[in-house]
A protein has these predicted regions:
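Conserved alpha/beta-hydrolase "acid-adjacent" motif
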Residues: 222-227
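Catalytic active-site module of serine/aspartate enzymes centered on a nucleophile-bearing elbow/loop
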Residues: 238-292
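Flexible "cap/lid" loop of the alpha/beta hydrolase fold
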Residues: 102, 106-107, 112-145
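Conserved alpha/beta-hydrolase catalytic His-Asp/Glu region
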Residues: 126-132, 143-205
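Conserved HGGG/HGGXW glycine-rich cap/lid loop of the alpha/beta-hydrolase fold
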Residues: 7-66
Length: 292
C-alpha cells in the first residue's frame, strides 16, 4: 500500500495515468476514493494522485491534537509531492481540501501549476456559529461514534441535494464516510475546521496570488457561495464556476459538469491562455470604458 512519510506521519495515496501531475485533495466527509470519478476521467490525460489526509485511515491518525492544522494540511500536499519527486502540479481540492489547496498556493506558489478550489468558505460568514456547530459534531463523534455521526453529517443542508438527485451515489458517499475514524474526524474538525482563518481574512494574500485559479461552487451550497464570489473578486488570476441546483460535493453530485469545467481550465492553463483579469474590466461603470 503506497505511503508517503510526511513529518513522521504516513499518508496513503493512489495514482493513475501519466503526464502532467494533477493531485486531488479531499473534503472532510471524503477520502482519496471520493475522487474516483475524476481519477478515471483525468488519468487519460494526466498523472493523477489522490491521498488520504492525516486522520483518515489507512493514513496515520496521530493522537496529538497539535498534529492537525490548516497549515499542516497545506504542508501535507507539499509532502506528498516531495515524496513523489514532483516539482510542480495542478492541485484540485474540495471543501477542507479546497482550503488546503488555497493555502498551498499561498504558501508554495512556485510548486503549483494551477489551483482548483471547490466548495471552500464554510464558516467564513459566521465564524462563531461555525465553531458552535463544530463542537456539536465533535462531541457526537466522541460519544456516539462514526456510524451515527457520519449518517447525521451526511444529511446536512448542503448534502440533501445529492441525496435527492442520486440516492445510490449519496449512499456510497454516506457508507464511505461512516467507515472512517471517529477519532480522526474529531481531531481534524477541532484542529483544522474550527481554527482555520476565514476566506475574508485572506484578502491581502489573495490579491498577490498569481497562480491560475478556478473557483467552483454549487449555487445551493450557501456557506460557500459568497466566499466563492469574494475569492473571484480578490484573486486576479481566478475564474468562477457556479453549478445550478447543486450542493457541496460538486465533484460527486455533478461529475460531468465538474470534470468539463476543470478540463477546460487545465487546457487553458497548459496552453498558457489563462491570464490575469484585465484591469480595465474593473471600471466602476458597467457601461463606460475605463479612462485611458
Amino acid at each position: 500500500m503506497p505511503m508517503a512519510n510526511v513529518s513522521g506521519v504516513r499518508l496513503h495515496y493512489i495514482e493513475a495515468g501519466e503526464g502532467v501531475p494533477l493531485i486531488f485533495v479531499h473534503e472532510f466527509a471524503g477520502d482519496a476514493e471520493s475522487w474516483q470519478p475524476q481519477i478515471r476521467f483525468f488519468s487519460r490525460r494526466y498523472r493523477t494522485i489522490a491521498f488520504n489526509a492525516r486522520g483518515y485511515p489507512p493514513s496515520d491518525v496521530p493522537d496529538d491534537p497539535a498534529a492537525y492544522s490548516q497549515q499542516q494540511a497545506a504542508d501535507d500536499i507539499k509532502g506528498v509531492l516531495d515524496h513523489l519527486h514532483i516539482d510542480k502540479a495542478h492541485v484540485c481540492g474540495l471543501s477542507m481540501g479546497g482550503y488546503a489547496t488555497l493555502h498551498f498556493g499561498l504558501s508554495y506558489p512556485e510548486r503549483a501549476l494551477s489551483l482548483e478550489v471547490a466548495g471552500a468558505g464554510y464558516g467564513s460568514d459566521d465564524p462563531e456559529g461555525h465553531k458552535r456547530d463544530s463542537e456539536v459534531v465533535i462531541r457526537r463523534f466522541e460519544t456516539e461514534g462514526m456510524e451515527k455521526t457520519g449518517d447525521y453529517y451526511a444529511h446536512g443542508p448542503s448534502r440533501v441535494q445529492y441525496l435527492e438527485k442520486d440516492p445510490l451515489g449519496w449512499k456510497e458517499f454516506r457508507d464511505q464516510l461512516v467507515a472512517g475514524s471517529a477519532q480522526g474526524h474529531a481531531l481534524t474538525m477541532r484542529g483544522v475546521q474550527m481554527k482555520r482563518p476565514t476566506i475574508y481574512s485572506l484578502e491581502a494574500r489573495m490579491t498577490l496570488l498569481e497562480v491560475p485559479t478556478l473557483i467552483v461552487t454549487g449555487d445551493e451550497d450557501e456557506p460557500c457561495l459568497e466566499p466563492g464570489i469574494f475569492m473571484k473578486r480578490k484573486i486576479p488570476t481566478s475564474g468562477l464556476v457556479v453549478l445550478p441546483k447543486t450542493g457541496h460535493a460538486v465533484n460527486l453530485e455533478e461529475p460531468d459538469a465538474f470534470n468539463r469545467a476543470v478540463l477546460d481550465f487545465l487546457t487553458a492553463v497548459d496552453a498558457g491562455r489563462w491570464r490575469r483579469r484585465r484591469p480595465d474590466s474593473l471600471a466602476k461603470s458597467g457601461i463606460l470604458p475605463a479612462a485611458r
